[in-house]
């Protein structure tokens, strides 16, 4: 099971974090700071897997963002690397060509896509099409809620 997922920039700015195990805020901040230092200090040619505390850390850099997952000891690192890649593919499909600014200004969509893809640290749906369809339906529903309607339409009389 995945314990948490972090997205951070090369400058060490946290852009997204998702925790799948209850952890205090103080401990989270400490873990994020430590892990960012470890990952950012590594050379590009080094392996994307590392042992850290009692966890395995799998990370991948895409452009200026690091996607970093902490998994339990018995979990498969290659599957986790593929999950990171699938998440990036979903972000790319939704945003066009995703960049750090898309994550910054549309963080709620990035979280929503992650929640459609992963639930409780485990894969919920591996199909890109079904995840993107669910996101598209949610967008349509949100657009309907935000569109101005008359009083008669609100009452179902129009």
From Swiss-Prot:
It is a peripheral membrane protein. The modification Phosphoserine is found at residue 147. One of its GO terms (biological process) is retrograde transport, endosome to Golgi. The keyword Transport applies. GO terms for cellular component: AP-1 adaptor complex; clathrin-coated pit; cytoplasmic vesicle membrane; cytosol; early endosome; Golgi apparatus; Golgi membrane; intracellular membrane-bounded organelle. The keyword Plastid does not apply. Widely expressed. It is found in: Golgi apparatus; Cytoplasmic vesicle membrane; Membrane, Clathrin-coated pit. Induction: Up-regulated in response to enterovirus 71 (EV71) infection. It comes from the Eukaryota. Keywords: Coated pit, Cytoplasmic vesicle, Deafness, Golgi apparatus, Ichthyosis, Intellectual disability, Membrane, Neuropathy, Phosphoprotein, Protein transport, Transport. GO terms for molecular function: clathrin adaptor activity. Adaptor protein complex 1 (AP-1) is a heterotetramer composed of two large adaptins (gamma-type subunit AP1G1 and beta-type subunit AP1B1), a medium adaptin (mu-type subunit AP1M1 or AP1M2) and a small adaptin (sigma-type subunit AP1S1 or AP1S2 or AP1S3). Belongs to the adaptor complexes small subunit family. It is linked to MEDNIK syndrome: A disorder characterized by erythematous skin lesions and hyperkeratosis, severe psychomotor retardation, peripheral neuropathy, sensorineural hearing loss, together with elevated very-long-chain fatty acids and severe congenital diarrhea. Subunit of clathrin-associated adaptor protein complex 1 that plays a role in protein sorting in the late-Golgi/trans-Golgi network (TGN) and/or endosomes. The AP complexes mediate both the recruitment of clathrin to membranes and the recognition of sorting signals within the cytosolic tails of transmembrane cargo molecules. This is AP-1 complex subunit sigma-1A. It comes from Homo sapiens (Human). The gene is AP1S1.
């Amino acid at each position: 099971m995945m314990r948490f997922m972090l997205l951070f920039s090369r400058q060490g700015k946290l852009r997204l974090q998702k925790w799948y195990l209850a952890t205090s805020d103080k401990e989270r901040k400490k873990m994020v700071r430590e892990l960012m230092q470890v990952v950012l200090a590594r050379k590009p040619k080094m392996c994307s897997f590392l042992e850290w505390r009692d966890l395995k850390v799998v990370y991948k850099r895409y452009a200026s963002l690091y996607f970093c997952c902490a998994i339990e000891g018995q979990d498969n690192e290659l599957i986790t690397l593929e999950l990171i890649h699938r998440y990036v593919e979903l972000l790319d499909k939704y945003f066009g060509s995703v960049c750090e600014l898309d994550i910054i200004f549309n963080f709620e969509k990035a979280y929503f896509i992650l929640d459609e893809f992963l639930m409780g640290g485990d894969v919920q749906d591996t199909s890109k099409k079904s995840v993107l369809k669910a996101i598209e339906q949610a967008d349509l529903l949100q657009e309907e809620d935000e569109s101005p309607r008359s009083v008669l339409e609100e009452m179902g009389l129009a």
